[in-house]
Structure formats: C-alpha cells, structure tokens
Regions:
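Short alpha-helix
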Residues: 145-156, 167-168
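A short glycine-rich, Lys/Arg-flanked "PGG" loop and its adjoining helix->strand segment in the class I
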Residues: 121-133
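A short SAM/SAH-binding and catalytic strip from SAM-dependent methyltransferases
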Residues: 107-119
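Core SAM-dependent methyltransferase catalytic element
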Residues: 159-174
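A short acidic, Gly/Pro-enriched loop at the edge of an enzyme's catalytic core
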Residues: 96-108
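Class I SAM-dependent methyltransferase SAM/SAH-binding core
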Residues: 47, 53-97
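Conserved class I S-adenosyl-L-methionine
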Residues: 1-40, 145-147
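Conserved beta-strand signature within the Rossmann-like core of class I S-adenosyl-L-methionine
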Residues: 134-142
Length: 174
C-alpha cells in the first residue's frame, strides 16, 4: 500500500462508524443512478471497488450471482461484512492493484473512489485487466471544480455530472 493510500485508509477507519450517517444520503443518490444504468441486467460477478460500508452491494445483490467488495479500510470492510449481503465477499486492497484474476468480472462499479489527477490511468488499466469483454462499467470520478474534463474514454462512455466536483461515467459493451 502506498503512503497516500495508508493515509486514506486511516481516515476512513476513523470515519467508519459515522460514515453512513454523514454521507449515506449523498451516496444513495449515486447508487440509484448506477443501478438505473445497470437495470434489467444480470451479472455473474459484480465488483465494487471502494465498497466502503457495503451499501451498494446490499442494494445490488439481486442483479448478480456473486459480488466482490474491495476497500482500503479494514473498519469499513467490517461494517460491509456485518451487513451479511448474500453471495458477497470482501477484500482489503487498493483500487490501483486489484487482487483479481484477469477477465474475472462482467461488471465493475466504483463510486467516489477515483481522482482524475491521481490514480486514473492505473485504475483504468487494472479495470481493463479484470473485466471480461462485453462488461459493464460505472464509476464516478472526482475532478477539481472548474477544471477542464481531461478524461478520455471510449465513445461508448456516457457521462453525467453529479456535483460540481464529481462525474459519473458509464460504459456499456460496444
């Protein structure tokens, strides 16, 4: 784990007990947008990168056979595990070094994890590695307010600004 990631993990470990109370409503809106994008689909393996307290996987468990939540924070993962979401596993790991086999997932979601100026290239490269062809992807990306959109994604990507600093990108199979 890199130095910045250790600081992030420590911050979320400290925040974990009150995270849902503080950010639950804001995050719930994002989860609903992603679930709308994924509606009427069913996946073999759905991966939630930066799963936090596991709320998204709890809401999405009916659209997949198996789900995997990945997060840097041990305490956030404990809360996620305590939800007892059916057919869900949780892994302590970084979003830029996913401990998953190549071509192992057909859907990946990452909400409020990636930052355009920091880890985006590694994040996208690792996503590409673990996703099967014809996979669905939905992720939000933090960018500095007023900064130009420097993200270059395939033509299949749709973007929706969800706040002054965060954009939702959704990609369907070509």
């Amino acid at each position: 784990m890199e130095k910045d990631e250790k600081h992030i993990a420590e911050w979320y470990n400290t925040l974990s007990g009150s995270y849902d109370e503080l950010y639950g409503e804001e995050q719930s809106h994002k989860y609903e947008m992603v679930l709308e994008f994924l509606r009427e689909k069913h996946f073999k393996v759905l991966v939630d990168i930066g799963c936090g307290t596991g709320t998204f996987l709890e809401k999405a468990h009916e659209i997949c056979d198996h789900s995997i939540g990945i997060d840097l924070s041990t305490r956030m993962l404990k809360i996620a595990k305590d939800r007892r979401t059916p057919n869900a596993d949780y892994i302590l790991a970084s979003s830029s070094s996913l401990p998953l086999k190549d071509d192992s997932s057909d859907c990946a979601v990452s909400i409020s994890t990636a930052k355009a100026e920091l880890n985006l290239p590694r994040f996208l490269a690792d996503l590409d590695r673990v996703l099967r062809e014809d996979s669905f992807v939905a992720f939000t990306l933090f960018q500095q307010p007023g900064a130009p959109n420097s993200v270059s994604l395939s033509k299949a990507a749709r973007s929706t600004k969800i706040s002054d600093r965060e954009t939702l990108y959704s990609l369907r199979p070509a």
